[in-house]
Amino acid sequence: MTNFQEYQEFKDMYDNAKSMLNSSNHTINYYRQNYDKTILNSFYFIVDMPPYIANTLKSKTPKLKLSLDSLLKNMIEHPEITFKEYLQLEYFLYNAEYILLKNEKNLIYFKIDNCLYQFVIKNTKDGCENFLTTFHKTNIKQLNKDIARYKQIKR
């Protein structure tokens, strides 16, 4: 996010998602079945990826998007992730310690203040769009398991 307007638009999306969740204990499937797909598929550009990540994904654009659906899913499954951490995604991407390639998805790990995070980026088949599909805290055991299974792009 490069300016206040972009920040405010993302904060509005985040706050709307949070208010939807505060009123219930539903799973993401509930929202997918009961809300208009055009609303859930709405997205926000959150950051430009480093060129080598975009190239690895065979992406035609460095733009990374986050859909309302993915944000809701992450807020339900990983409530420990704060708004502030979402704002740090650009920093996290550019300072990732490990980047692993799993099929069409990148598994990216980074450590900040002794906390290990993982996020997954997936792009469309035509390479025109990139989406952040998950973002959560993880542990060294999971990182080591994934290092053993997937192609390592960066360390």
Where are these regions (language model features)?
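Ribonuclease/tRNase effector modules and their secretory precursors
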Residues: 1-155
